Amino acid sequence: MVLAPKGGVGKTYIASLIAQALMERGERVVCFDTDRENASLRDIPALKAEPVPLFLPKSDEIDVRALDAMTERMLTEDAHFVVDNGSTSFAPLSRYLVQDGIAEAVVEAGKKMVVHLVVAGGQELVQTGRGFDSVAAQFPASADMVLWLNEHHGPVDGADGASFEQTALYQSHKHRILAVIRLVRLHPSTFGANLADMLTRGLTFEEADRSSAFFVIAKQRLRQVWRPIRDQLVPVL
């Protein structure tokens, strides 16, 4: 489950990476797209993301029945579930998960909930840092957490050379974090351009590697993007 209160920080991209890593090792994966404003995860056909309407039609009221149905599947089906979440539904979904004891129910069902949190660099650093602090403080110990540091918009480390992991914010929640995964900033005219092209086409890394739409060197760059991310993900999936 990918959570962040700010839009445009890479939540959907991260959800797609988690799904691809699981699919690559042959796991059964079910993707849920709960973002009512942007169906970005559904824009990647290979992931077969299913829409989950968090809100009642023409309303800001939560559709509890839809959430309960999603949770029922997560508790009873033998699969890995990847849930993408939009900024507008961040608060109500988080409230549902915490107040209704969903993490505890997942553990009782013999499974585990892993919450993937995003801290983005540049101008997004303060707000996403607060979001990380809020979720880490609210969610029960039964929910594991993975922290993603997204450097696409700028550095997440301090100007003094101190890493994000050395900050008081991270240290206060360190005991909750299974792993820290870094999305390094890509050169915009090479690696970044090839990745953007792949995402615009709605392809997975595997599909791009087989596609005739990409030059050989572009495929090589995409492999160089994917491999270190996949290697960081493997221990926590």
Show which residues each predicted segment covers.
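Nucleotide-state-sensitive switch-loop elements of NTP-binding domains
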Residues: 1, 24, 28-90
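Hydrophobic residues on the short alpha-helix immediately C-terminal to a glycine-rich phosphate/catalytic loop
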Residues: 17-18
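Hydrophobic positions on the alpha1 helix immediately C-terminal to the Walker A/P-loop
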Residues: 13-14
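Rossmann-fold NAD(P)-dependent oxidoreductase module
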Residues: 21
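NTP-binding/hydrolysis catalytic cores, primarily Walker-type P-loop NTPases
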Residues: 193-237
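Conserved catalytic-core segment of NTP-binding enzymes
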Residues: 89-192
